[in-house]
Amino acid sequence: MGRTRENKATVISDVQELFQDAQMTVIIDYQGLTVAEITDLRNRLRPLGGTCKIAKNTLVRRALAGQEAWSPMEEFLTGTTAILVLKEDLGGAIKAYKKFQKDTKKTELRGGVLEGKSLTQADVEAIGDLPSKEQLMGQIAGGINALATKIALGIKEVPASVARGLQAHVDKE
């Protein structure tokens, strides 16, 4: 038995609601995955602000109607489609998916959409290779700390060099 009209409307509204808060979507082919593997993928994405949504392509197209920012996604909606909706840590979520893909070897990354622009598989993987927010903050803090250390050593070196010069003059006499 197929879905009822009310059930389809619920799925469409759920998908629209997911897209409202999303920064990026990644479209994958999930053919061959078991329910346990899909649950594993969802569990890997959840702590990073990601969601894995599986819905019929027709219902996703209806949910996309009137949403210009997500319209480029339609080109990827063929076959068995799962949509990874990423809200927070884009790089971390993509890394989690790539690790899942490496572990299962069953999914295929089709592409993605970011800020209304269609992304190829290479584009999505490049975003995944970017450092995370925490790593960037650590690099910035390390750079600031190194700069402060160099300034402190420079300030300390001026009186020390004067003292060495005076000591050399005293030793000479």
From Swiss-Prot:
One of its GO terms (molecular function) is large ribosomal subunit rRNA binding. InterPro entries: Ribosomal_uL10, Ribosomal_uL10-like_sf, Ribosomal_uL10_bac, Ribosomal_uL10_bac_type, Ribosomal_uL10_CS_bac. One of its GO terms (biological process) is translation. Pfam families: Ribosomal_L10 (PF00466). Keywords: Ribonucleoprotein, Ribosomal protein, RNA-binding, rRNA-binding. CDD domains: Ribosomal_L10. GO terms for cellular component: cytosolic large ribosomal subunit. Belongs to the universal ribosomal protein uL10 family. Forms part of the ribosomal stalk, playing a central role in the interaction of the ribosome with GTP-bound translation factors. This is Large ribosomal subunit protein uL10. The lineage of its organism: Bacteria, Bacillati, Cyanobacteriota, Cyanophyceae, Synechococcales. The gene is rplJ.
